[in-house]
Amino acid sequence: LKCNKLIPLAYKTCPAGKNLCYKMFMVSNKTVPVKRGCIDACPKNSLLVKYVCCNTDRCN
C-alpha cells in the first residue's frame, strides 16, 4: 500500500501491518489536512480532530 505524505506529491510505501492510509483534519478547518500517512487502525474522531481512512494506493 502506498500512502500520500503531507504534501501529496510525495508518498511512502507502508510497512507490514499498516494497511490503511489516513488524513487528519482539525475540525475547525476541514480544508487543510494537518497529517497524512500509514496507520494500522482508523482512530476515532474527537471534538477537535477528524480522521479519514481508506485502503487503496494514494487514496488519502
UniProtKB/Swiss-Prot annotation:
Glycosylation sites: N29
Record localization: Secreted; Target cell membrane
Record Pfam families: Toxin_cobra-type
Database matches in InterPro entries: Cytotoxin_Cobra, Snake_3FTx, Snake_toxin-like_sf, Snake_toxin_con_site, Toxin_cobra-type
Gene3D superfamilies named in the record: CD59 (2.10.60.10)
GO molecular function, one term: toxin activity
GO cellular component, one term: other organism cell membrane
Lipid biosynthesis among keywords: no
Record-annotated disulphide pairs: C3-C21, C14-C38, C42-C53, C54-C59
PTM description: May be regulated by glycosylation.
Tissue: Expressed by the venom gland.
UniProt-listed GO biological process terms: killing of cells of another organism
Keywords tagged on the record: Cardiotoxin, Cytolysis, Disulfide bond, Glycoprotein, Membrane, Secreted, Target cell membrane, Target membrane, Toxin
Task performed by this protein: Heterodimer: has no cytolytic activity, but retains most of the alpha-cobratoxin capacity to compete with alpha-bungarotoxin for binding to Torpedo and alpha-7/CHRNA7 nicotinic acetylcholine receptors (nAChRs) as well as to Lymnea stagnalis acetylcholine-binding protein. Monomer: shows cytolytic activity. Exhibits concentration-dependent growth inhibitory effects in the lung cell lines A549 (IC(50)=1.22 ug/ml) and NL20 (IC(50)=2.76 ug/ml), in the prostate cell lines PC-3 (IC(50)=4.46 ug/ml) and RWPE-1 (IC(50)=0.65 ug/ml), and in the breast cell lines MCF-7 (IC(50)=12.23 ug/ml) and 184B5 (IC(50)=2.83 ug/ml), with high selectivity for the lung cancer cell line A549 (selectivity index=2.26). Induces primarily necrosis in the A549 cell line, and mainly late apoptosis in the MCF-7 and PC-3 cell lines.
Record family assignment: Belongs to the three-finger toxin family. Short-chain subfamily. Type IA cytotoxin sub-subfamily.
Assembly notes: Monomer, or heterodimer with alpha-cobratoxin (AC P01391); disulfide-linked.
Entry protein name: Cytotoxin 3
The organism of origin for this protein: Naja kaouthia (Monocled cobra)
